Amino acid sequence: MIRVELVAPDYIYQVWDDVKDYLDASIKTGTNTCTLDQLKLLLAKNYQTLIVGVNEYNVIKGAMTVEIINYPNARTLFITALGGIGVVTSEIWQQVEDWAKLQGVTKISAWCEEAQARLYKQKAGFNTIRFVVEKDL
């Protein structure tokens, strides 16, 4: 079974080699809002949080980065990157949701491609709420 653990900002540099490939895959399919090195800095400065999935041998099998955003009507846990092996399961999501509730979070959201959206729906009970369009200027 995979258990979810938070990585304190002080330990980002110690675990970085174990998580960077998981996060890089997600960053590369993103919208170029940040690079992998920039994400590392955001984590180290505590602007975002690193959550890891660890197996029974304490081996990191996946990683997720999140940012808590306060909107007028919701406190949202926004997933900025996610990757790993077997880390999108209902058991793992329940652990993430339990932690998020302790932080006062009322919603979890993520930007993702269509295939990723299907996985979020199937494994974690997400709903497609809106489509994001973008144009570079």
Description of each model-found segment:
Residues 1, 5-12, 111-137:
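Terminal substrate-recognition subdomain of acyl/acetyltransferases
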Residues 1-34:
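Short amphipathic alpha-helix that is part of the acyltransferase structural core
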Residues 3, 20, 48-52, 62-65, ...:
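Ordered hydrophobic segments in well-structured contexts
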Residues 40-41, 67-69, 98:
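Short, flexible, glycine/charge-rich loop motifs used to bind or transfer phosphoryl groups or to couple energy/partner
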Residues 45-87:
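Conserved donor-binding loop and adjoining core beta-sheet/short helix segment
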Residues 74-123:
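Acyl-donor binding region in acyl/amide transferases
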